[in-house]
Every structure is written in C-alpha cells, then in structure tokens.
C-alpha cells in the first residue's frame, strides 16, 4: 500500500511464496488500517501515530470545514469507535474533499485536562516525540491540534494453519503475521505480540519434532541454477520500467481500489490492472548493473511477489460480498450472518487462484 506504517522491506513475500508452494491462504481480504498516521514529511508519511484514545478522553476529530464528523459515523462512541470505523471515517472525509488543504484531518486534544498529558506521553513516548518534532511541542502537550491520515498497518489474513502452525503443505510451518485466521476480521491492540509468543513457540516445537524424523531433501542443482538465472533477467532488460516506478504504481492501485473502502467495480478494475502488472513483472529493468548490493534487483524480485500478494487480497475482497471488521464494501455496507465463513485461496493446476468458501 502507498500509505503504510510498515517498513519498505515488508512487502508481503511470505503470502506469495506460500501460495506458490501450494499452501492455502485464508481471509486475505482482512487488512487492517489505523486511523492516525503522519502525513508529512514525506519520509515519515504513513508512520504510526495510533488511535484517538491515546490523546485523552476529550479528543476530537475535525475535517477541513471545521466539522466534528464522527457524529455522522458513530454518534454514540464518536472518536472512541473501533479503529476500523475511525480509519474509514478519516479516509472518507479526505476522499470526498472535506479534508484540510493538505488532504488530512485534524486531531484536537485541546479540551483535555492538560495535567494528565504526562501519563499519556509515557504510554506512547516515541509517537509523542515525533509529534513534537513534526507539529511542535504545543501539539504534543495538548495545546494545539495536529494533522493525521489513515494508514495500512496489519494483515489478519494469511497462510492457513492449524493449532501447531502446520500449513496445508507437508512440513511447511507458518506463524505470526504471515499466518491467517488468528484475529478473525479485526485485531485487538497488542494481540499481535501475544500471537508471535504463543504461535512462535508452537511452531518452533513442531519444527524441531519434524526435523528429528524427516530426512533433509537435496535441492537439484538445476533448480538452483534456474533461480539464479531469474535474478539475472532484470539486469539484462534494457527498456523496461524501473522496479521502483512499478512498485509505486502497484501501491497506488491498492490504496485507491483495494484499500479502506472497497466496491465490486473497484475490485474488478484492480484485478485487471494487477494482471497487466503481473505480465509486466518480468520486464522491469534494474538500471543499476552491479551484481552485488544491488537494491534495484532486489526490488524487481520483490515486485513479482508483491503483485501476487495484491492479487490474493483483491480476489478475496471481491469474493466477500458483505462488510465485516476491517473489510468494508460500500456496495455491501452491512454484515451478513450468512457470510460468517472463511474465504480460502489455493493454487490451481494452471497456477491461477482457486476460491472456496468454508
């Protein structure tokens, strides 16, 4: 996604690699977006601020027209609505032209009791320090409003596993954010840390047990040579799109068409565009010809996998014709009890994505 709290090196490779290996994936449409992230400077765009509850009990959100717009989205919980609701509200206000001139919303903590600000600053010291650096000490001390935008944050969907982290491929284990189904359609704050502790331990124990009884398979030399040849393709291409440009096109497409607010038409357009990007992937050109420490070659390899992961997300989002948790369809805005099911993706004999609902 073009706006994300994650580091640039986190490109979703695990989902695509597991799919290629024959593993099933579950609920890939469940992508979490946080309501508050830094809009500027460009080097910090999308970086985590968090949620409204971190800025006092009387925090308020305003659009560029001075409206407290959460009255429209959740008049009872207002700024303390769940993160998906507030992120969607922030996105909608900006998308429909009611944001500030910088296409942001305003977080206003000024009606809080400022004697409490120290307690809150301790709870999220890094974010408060970054707010002070970006917007000034007054914003960090609840004396002035500051700007924010929503940002992609986490994947609830992922590789389908059992309680011992086994996938549907023999001896392939998975845990953490690469796995899916642990958090359902939404994730509570802090549970990702619990997840990696619990399932990381289970995966490690199961891997050790498998290793004791499973002989190591030898990789055929020709497979290794073929993999090396694939990495050379991008150095030999002369006229292709630079991988960085291709990546930007993909990320913008995902934000615009498979982002916080989705629709059937947008998802169809996204899948067609992703098919074009997939055909283009082998033709991207690393202009840097160095064979070592070549960032462009790495980006070219990552791009192929990013496109595949993006197709998995868009395919699953198109299949789920309802809104649930982090997945919101403006053409199906209500939660449908009949959809209390999982979308399962797997690789078909023609390498295409097979969809099942269970």
Predicted region positions:
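Glycine- and aromatic-enriched mobile tails/lids
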Residues: 55, 62-71, 75-80, 90, ...
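FAD/FMN-dependent oxidoreductases across multiple families
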Residues: 129-172
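A generic structural signal for short coil/turn motifs at secondary-structure boundaries
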Residues: 1-2, 115-117, 183-184
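An anion/pyrophosphate-binding glycine-rich loop and adjacent beta-alpha core
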Residues: 23-140, 206, 210-213, 247
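Short glycine-/small-residue-rich flexible loop motifs, especially phosphate/cofactor-binding loops
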Residues: 15, 128-129, 318
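Proline- and acidic/polar-enriched loop/turn elements at helix boundaries
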Residues: 30-31, 144, 333
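Glycine-rich loop(s) and the adjacent beta-strand/alpha-helix scaffold that form part
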Residues: 1-44, 189-206
């Amino acid at each position: 996604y073009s706006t994300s709290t994650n580091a640039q090196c986190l490109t979703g490779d695990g989902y695509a690699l597991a799919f290629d290996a024959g593993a099933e994936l579950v609920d890939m449409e469940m992508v979490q977006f946080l309501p508050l992230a830094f809009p500027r400077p460009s080097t910090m765009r999308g970086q985590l601020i968090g949620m409204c509850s971190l800025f006092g009990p009387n925090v308020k959100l305003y659009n560029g027209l001075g409206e407290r717009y959460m009255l429209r989205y959740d008049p009872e919980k207002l700024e303390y609505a769940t993160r998906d609701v507030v992120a969607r509200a922030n996105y909608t206000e900006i998308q429909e032209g009611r944001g500030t001139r910088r296409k942001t919303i305003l977080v206003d903590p000024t009606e809080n009791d400022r004697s409490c600000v120290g307690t809150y600053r301790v709870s999220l010291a890094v974010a408060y320090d970054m707010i002070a650096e970006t917007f000034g000490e007054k914003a960090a001390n609840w004396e002035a409003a500051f700007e924010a935008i929503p940002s992609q944050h986490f994947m609830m969907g992922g590789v389908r596993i059992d309680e011992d982290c086994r996938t549907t491929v023999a001896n392939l284990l998975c845990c953490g954010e690469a796995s899916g189904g642990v958090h359902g359609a939404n994730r509570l704050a802090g549970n990702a840390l619990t997840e990696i502790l619990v399932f990381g331990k289970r995966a490690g124990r199961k891997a050790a047990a498998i290793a004791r009884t499973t002989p190591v398979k030898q990789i055929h030399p020709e497979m290794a040579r073929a993999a090396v040849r694939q990495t050379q393709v991008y150095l030999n291409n002369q006229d292709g799109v630079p991988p960085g440009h291709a990546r930007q096109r993909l990320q913008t497409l995902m934000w615009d068409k498979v982002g916080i607010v989705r629709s059937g038409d947008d998802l169809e357009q996204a899948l067609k565009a992703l098919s074009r990007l997939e055909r283009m992937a082998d033709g991207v050109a690393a202009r840097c010809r160095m064979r070592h420490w070549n960032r462009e070659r790495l980006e070219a390899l990552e791009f192929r996998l990013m496109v595949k992961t993006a197709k998995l997300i868009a395919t699953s989002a198109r299949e789920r014709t309802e809104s649930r948790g982090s997945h919101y369809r403006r053409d199906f805005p209500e939660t449908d009890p009949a959809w209390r099911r999982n979308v399962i993706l797997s690789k078909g004999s023609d390498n295409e994505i097979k969809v099942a609902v269970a």
